[in-house]
């Protein structure tokens, strides 16, 4: 396998014409994988990783059952007091693993969707994908328990939501105005169906599932963590292969096709992968709103780099969700709320900002 770092041309040229190269090196893995190494992105990624580790340490150490920071290394290695081991293995550890994995999945799903639609509003949240996945998960869990696994129900619901939006808009998820209107309609129908299933068809379980409907990380287990991290493990190799074609796709279909990226196939693969990641996240934590909308936008502004910024979007998504979960566990204002309510409040403000910005630019 050819493994090396070099500057590579981004477009073909006729003989005698200088070939344009990116202003940053490219890591090549074999013939088909080329990953840009943007210096600012590397620095930002390292900073985000440090912040994520700090938020994770705070999650494990704060509160009545928290593990003191001085004892955290020993407890993580399997030593320490029984109460601390119990808190790590049964309470804080699974919740943290689910929060980080769900944030990564939502960040990646949003980055893929926004990149292939070339639209900052082209988020799984806005088009009703999360709500559709939540409806499918609720239906599988309550109406077909033991017959259809919850992740499969979420996947079916998410796929159906995307198909309906694409069919209604008739523009392949590209027109921002139609995308928003269709997404709002699909999300409203999916949420209505979810509430109907939870409150009418399964009244005895409504109280237990009320938090899940709004997006919650409470009472998570290692099984939930395994579900979302397995989906990520399966998706990462595909993401590595898709990173280059997705970046070229942002330049337009004609240029992407001319450079061998096959825009239509790239778009289809990215949407399918986004649906799978969103479904995995929703199946373990419920429809947590607006992480997939805000994480890619924050990553793009921090890095100032072209392309989908997949790695940074994943880190920002994890940091947002772990921090939001930390807030609902310990902040007096948000304590006790499902984490999805907090992300909805913050993300709703950001969505309003995006709508105003796109309207002023004449894109709505």
What kind of region is each of these model predictions?
Residues 2-364:
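Alpha-helical transmembrane segments in inner-membrane proteins
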